[in-house]
Amino acid sequence: PLNIQPWSVLCKDSCRIDLYLDKRRLLSLMDPGSRQACISCGTFIENLDIAAREAGLRAEISLFPSSWPVGDIDPGQPVAEIVLVPDLGVVSDPLFAWLETRHTNRSIYTNDPIPSDIISILADAANQPFTTLGFSAEPSFRQELSTHITDAMEITFSDRDRFSEFLFHVRIPPISAHQYSDGYGASETGLDGVRGWLSLLPLRISPAGLRNGLARGLILRLARKQAESAAAFGWIATKGSSRHDQVRAGRTYERVHLTAASAGLSLQPMTCVLEPYSGMGDHYRRVLDLLGIPDTHTVQMLFRLGYSHSSS
């Protein structure tokens, strides 16, 4: 979440790796249950597995080897233990070629539709058990889901402390002074080019006491445009919501994103409506109904897809 990569790696030797959640990078307000952080661990594992195959190695992955996780995760216990084993029979993954290309694109997408055969290719990207993947490009569906996503963003940032946590990791000048390599800047938010410069101008010339409110309005307007420009939406659901489910959802998401990159598609997660914030429950239930997901299942990821002229 927010490009903070909330994990750390312990290399026991050249072939043994332990993956941990990094408690210094967890978002206590944006991601209160560390669900997104576990999904992020899944994306790391999938990337490692793909890269290992390219090197002729088989990745033997054991999730939560120390104990079955219940409730909050103990940062001292590994999320995964990974052993890399040389294997002449391992098959390389064509998605390896897109590891460095794949990135989250938060710009406004074009009006170009996604061909149905591309959607089918994306749907075939999933390979994790107990995980379902869905897509829809139907106009009325997109309009209704866009409304829920935008309303969810308003609920998310109605909490001042939660918005402050967001601003700490998103460098919007002149508000954010965060200079570390994690998070992302204004251009990666989708505020790039002349339009982005003009959008940020009121923040630059306004008194400091007004800037957070102006930034909130700017981010909400941008989120609405982002959602409304989606050529399609995709989602990943699991039957439960155990930590294993969350990691598997992350692996599925990474394969979908890499496959999208290979097809020239842009992708952006839009997951606020999935979070257990106060006031979000009704929107989440309506999204479940819209997606056709039973309330005994959990939507782990929700994302928009489309084509973009910008690399942001």
Model-inferred region functions:
Residues 1-312:
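Acidic, surface-exposed loops and disordered segments
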